[in-house]
Design a protein with these regions (language model features):
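OB-fold and OB-like single-stranded nucleic-acid-recognition modules
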Residues: 4-237
Length: 237
């Protein structure tokens, strides 16, 4: 009888431990990445407003040359300044979580799926399922009410797949720390890239290229050279 009691006790204890891990996964994950990738922050002076549209402005600026994790050099050509305030739907870190199969594997810090406007409200966000594979983002939803509020076109034009290149190690670490649900502000440049293998890749410069009637999210992605990150009330440069 006593052996049976202890067996049940340890089973229940194990189930409880698993539940606690699941419930606190974000907290545990956040501490893990903060420990593995320490970053220095200052206090932000402005609150983030994820209801706003991203801002960009065409720019004429010299090329930026960056060295990847294998010490190979790529050229970034800024085409616009960029400022986006949004909620993180997915953070896929390079190269641990993403394998593209070209020079980008060692150049990019991470891929962020970001939502803003109405989609930053959990009422809508919880009804949309996002996935990410091989640097491509897809999403779907089953609630037909979303077709009218906020509307299919609104959804497709208020989510973006962003490929990020950190301007320095501190920003690289801060970007890797980001978790699903974080409210962030990212500033930098939209850039066209010439890779170490001379492959050329252009950034998207409009949010509407995610929208094609009847075909789903088949549009382009933003390539962002990140010079500043705000995560909540913490500012990283």
């Amino acid at each position: 009888m006593q052996k049976g009691f202890w067996a049940i006790y340890f089973v229940l204890l194990g189930v409880l431990a698993i539940l606690l891990l699941v419930l606190h996964f974000k907290t545990i994950s956040a501490y893990f990445y903060q420990f593995r990738y320490p970053a220095t922050a200052t206090s932000a002076t402005e609150a983030i407003d994820a209801s706003l549209e991203p801002k960009q402005e065409a720019v004429s600026k010299d090329s930026i040359f960056v060295t990847d994790r294998k010490r190979r050099r790529s050229e970034l050509m800024p085409v616009a300044t960029y400022d986006i305030q949004a909620k993180v739907a997915i953070n896929a870190r390079h190269p641990q979580s993403v394998k593209i199969g070209n020079f980008l594997d060692d150049l990019l810090t991470n891929d962020l799926v970001l939502v803003w406007g109405k989609l930053a409200d959990d009422y809508y966000l919880k009804r949309i399922k996002f996935s990410h594979q091989f640097a491509y983002m897809t999403f779907k939803y089953e609630d037909p009410a979303l077709n009218s509020d906020p509307g299919q076109e609104y959804i497709f034009t208020h989510v973006s797949s962003n490929h990020l290149i950190a301007a320095n190690t501190n920003l690289d670490h801060a970007l890797r720390q980001l978790q699903k649900g974080d409210i962030v502000r990212i500033k930098g440049y939209l850039v066209n890239i010439t890779g170490s293998d001379n492959t050329s890749i252009n950034t998207s410069t409009v949010r509407t290229d995610n929208w094609q009637q009847g075909e789903g999210n088949t549009g382009g992605s933003e390539f962002i050279y990140v010079t500043e990150l705000q995560n909540g009330d913490r500012l990283f440069k």
